[in-house]
Amino acid sequence: MVRIFITGSSDGIGQAAAKVLSEQGHSVVLHARNADRAASAQEAVPGAEAVLVGDLSSIAETKALAEEANKLPPFDTVIHNAGIGYGATASQEITADKISAVFAVNTLAPYILTCLMHKPKARLLYMSSDSHYGGDESLRNITQSHSYGNTKLHDVMLANAFSRRWGNAIQVVSMHPGWVRTKMGGVMAPGALDRPARVLADWAIGKGDLARLKSGTFFTTSGPESAHPGADNVQKQEELLRICKEVSGVGVPGG
């Protein structure tokens, strides 16, 4: 049995993967933005071990979520899946922390959780998108930007930064799940949830070829792909980590 924590698992790909994993007998901890969504997530995945609640647009709630996650037994796999800012979830909101909600949820929250949660035993994934190819690696004004593509590039950069820091200790990767029919993808999306959910579930338990992906790999449902070249820029990776630390007050463990 593998223990897995999936953010943004009250609907969409996160919930679909959680269902697959739970039905296979694995221990899955879900995450929802509020109590109402948590209740419906638990109903949708009745075999889930628990549902943790936290609004990832809030720095304080994200820190509290990390604390709650650390009270549970260690996870083998953590999936940073939560995201907003595309299609039906497009947002121009500035949060109470005076930053873009898109940046807060898509970039800052996975950074905070990675830094504050106990390191997973085996695998860590940042959910990206092919929209990251249009992202700007300059990192100009990123805390106020509402660009979805920029934040999805940040997710690949975060994966690469932590992969570089942690070496071969665990597998750290990023993924484009495809344009699928979810609340974010919209009803016009050509793909169904089944394939990305199963690929994500297979990766989460270290099944098949995905278990052998090199840490720092960006992959899709078809296998490894080349990411935006800016994602490999170590100087920019470190700059992104510095910005996230300055905004959140949370530093990377050990430096």
Curated annotation (Swiss-Prot):
<dbReference type="InterPro" id="IPR036291">
    <property type="entry name" value="NAD(P)-bd_dom_sf"/>
</dbReference>
<feature type="active site" description="Proton donor">
    <location>
        <position position="148"/>
    </location>
</feature>
<feature type="binding site">
    <location>
        <position position="182"/>
    </location>
    <ligand>
        <name>NADP(+)</name>
    </ligand>
</feature>
<dbReference type="InterPro" id="IPR002347">
    <property type="entry name" value="SDR_fam"/>
</dbReference>
<feature type="binding site">
    <location>
        <position position="37"/>
    </location>
    <ligand>
        <name>NADP(+)</name>
    </ligand>
</feature>
<comment type="function">
    <text>Involved in osmoadaptation.</text>
</comment>
<dbReference type="GO" id="GO:0016491">
    <property type="term" value="F:oxidoreductase activity"/>
</dbReference>
<dbReference type="GO" id="GO:0071470">
    <property type="term" value="P:cellular response to osmotic stress"/>
</dbReference>
<keyword id="KW-0560">Oxidoreductase</keyword>
<feature type="binding site">
    <location>
        <position position="152"/>
    </location>
    <ligand>
        <name>NADP(+)</name>
    </ligand>
</feature>
<feature type="binding site">
    <location>
        <position position="13"/>
    </location>
    <ligand>
        <name>NADP(+)</name>
    </ligand>
</feature>
<feature type="binding site">
    <location>
        <position position="55"/>
    </location>
    <ligand>
        <name>NADP(+)</name>
    </ligand>
</feature>
<feature type="binding site">
    <location>
        <position position="148"/>
    </location>
    <ligand>
        <name>NADP(+)</name>
    </ligand>
</feature>
<feature type="binding site">
    <location>
        <position position="180"/>
    </location>
    <ligand>
        <name>NADP(+)</name>
    </ligand>
</feature>
<keyword id="KW-0346">Stress response</keyword>
<keyword id="KW-0521">NADP</keyword>
<feature type="active site" description="Lowers pKa of active site Tyr">
    <location>
        <position position="152"/>
    </location>
</feature>
<protein>
    <recommendedName>
        <fullName>Uncharacterized oxidoreductase AN7799</fullName>
        <ecNumber>1.-.-.-</ecNumber>
    </recommendedName>
</protein>
<feature type="binding site">
    <location>
        <position position="81"/>
    </location>
    <ligand>
        <name>NADP(+)</name>
    </ligand>
</feature>
<comment type="similarity">
    <text>Belongs to the short-chain dehydrogenases/reductases (SDR) family.</text>
</comment>
<dbReference type="Pfam" id="PF00106">
    <property type="entry name" value="adh_short"/>
</dbReference>
